[in-house]
Amino acid sequence: MKFGAIDIGTNAARLLIGEVIQEDGKKFVNKVSYTRIPLRLGESVFESGRINKRKSEQFVKTMRAFQLISELFEVKELRACATSAMREAKNGKKIKNKIFQETGIEVETISGNEEANLIFGTFFLMDIDKA
């Protein structure tokens, strides 16, 4: 089964598509596709407290592209997590609603602690040599 993970950060949005493989009794994640778009959401958020119209439109287009890529690779599970810039953006909820309406992707804004836990957990779940 293929899964997708979308990381929406301050500087870039990333889509990782992977597949869990079992080999010799060990499980590891086989990277199927990786896409990075340098959105730079933080530029407008840290200046004005909001994601400006241009960045918002780029963000929605990026999520549309990620949704299409996920369909192409027949992703069964997709999780989208947003971090610092979306936590700070006064219009973050409105943008998340627009993304959901246009793509069906629900963007989850996570805390700094949850972000650290996900990074830590992912590190120990992956066989780095195989990733």
Where are these regions (language model features)?
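Conserved Rossmann-like nucleotide-cofactor binding loop
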Residues: N11-A13
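Nucleotide/phosphate-binding catalytic cleft detector across ATP-hydrolyzing
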Residues: M1-I8, I17-A131
